[in-house]
Amino acid sequence: MRTLVISDLHLGSSSRADLLRRGELREPLLCAVADVDRVVLLGDVLELRHGPARGALAIARPFFEELGRALDGRELVLVAGNHDHALIDPWLAVRAELEQVAPLALEQLLEPHEASPLVARLAQWAEPAHTRVAYPGLWIRPDVYAMHGHYLDCHLTVPTIERLSVGAMSRLLGRPAQTFASVGDYEAVTAPMYAWRHALARDAIAGDALNGIGTVNAWRALGGAGERDAADRRASSRRSLLLARLRREAIVRGFPLAVAALNRAGIGPLRAEVSLGELRRAGLRAMGEVAARVGLGGRYVVFGHTHRAGPLGDDDVREWNRPPAIAGGAPGARLINAGCWTYDSIFLSGPDAESPYWPGGAVLVEDSGPPQLQRLLLDRTRAELSPRHASGAEALTPGPA
């Protein structure tokens, strides 16, 4: 069975960075769908953290209708991530009421109506495709497992908002990530935080502190992706330039101290390094640890979450083929990241299409052989992908409200 996996669509993003809201950018994906038997949407399909779900649903409907027609009776599998964990929250709540229930496994397969009314609506729009739900992931082949990858935040050494939130929850519950050995362990510390984030956005638009803008601004100040010079260019006066530099210097000097304090508080282990290289390495280390702890060693593990596709041609494959969890033991997981379908402008510096964060990633899994990373939007320019380039009707489409 030929399976195409895509991840991190974030349909309904308040920044309009979600490219699949735009018909002309759906075409390459729909063409690829014509040659496969199954499509897996590997989490963060909807952006449910920026505002009420109705906004994301309105944006998502044309995509699901077109995808359903393209599949024409073939299978669509929907996997929840951290930004759309609410898609399976009702099922988790019902499950908690049962007197006898098996522990969460690596694959729970559900019909849409079992997962939530939200998923049932998406499945209806996707007809005539046959929609199922998998959580936290699914076995594509006996040697290929796919999941969104949000559990990696429990082990990430980069102090993102998500990592700090999970770390605080782990500390509060007295469940250190170093002891995790099952899906249930990860769900116990992540699900409460996800529920809180979704609750904040249920009736109002979330602010910058919670929708990622704060993290982006801090990363820019710390010099990520050459943003220091860009920030200086944006400063329109000598005074604003001076203030911008003073703010940046304060963040740069205070950042290691803040990280050290978080480590002393038991939120870590964290590192005071946020370069692009460290973002990649830290994400792979963390995902490799998740794979080892839940028993995926030696398999191919397809994931998303970090938005960083790979391995790419210039990547060191040794970073992606994780070492054994125990010296001399079974080999570690072989990681493949499906990338994203969002315009993450902060990561798209340099020549067009050269960034590993360039959107349009997909992973093709055939009946045998290694999963193949595909990049379906390499022929598009940054100007064509920018939200500012959207056609009139799409540019005026309201975000979550």
Describe each region flagged by the PLM.
Residues 1-401:
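Extended recognition/assembly regions associated with phosphoester-bond processing machinery
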